[in-house]
């Protein structure tokens, strides 16, 4: 199939920090494959930033209180420590990659929700912005969000709350979008999350084909509600040679949990 989902999970584990990611090593593997069947708080391969934590084997990107309720204006990020050689400046070769993960976005009973999470690709030494809660999803802020010249990032957003820059504004319409150097998505599709129960597990798969330059995303639920979106983007024009991948999420005045249950990634 076009969209590959890594079945064998390498039981890597995970380390919690609140600083920026480490610098890129002098050398790194040309082919990268990793997977998590669950998350373990004691392993150094995943860096946690901001409010991200591990709870019950899941990667919880935003904060909850002592009763397990999501809290407002929380921002959390998690990224894999391994630098990925996305493209080669000497010969122009570009990598293919695929990723799959399961997740739960839970409002804990509220009919209002916000704000969402994203899977992202970013420079290996990215400094994450401050003031990035709410609709900025932990990846942008008011100064950078709509100015591509100030960003170097590609993200797949699972956006629960419709902001001014989102499709169908001012009507509320959760959506999956592909972001290229801006919080305003270049391609979107409705995300049927509001039709699902609070604890519904969704499965997402994404694939990048280096020949066609097509980035494709699929998200589905066990009841066969699903969505798919894609766009053409030459990542050599957007991202540096070396990148890292991870997740970011935020709440604003409205809240929900953002939990990643498992994750696989392969690039070659």
What is each PLM-predicted segment?
Residues 1-268:
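Polar, low-complexity loop segments and adjacent catalytic/binding residues used for recognizing
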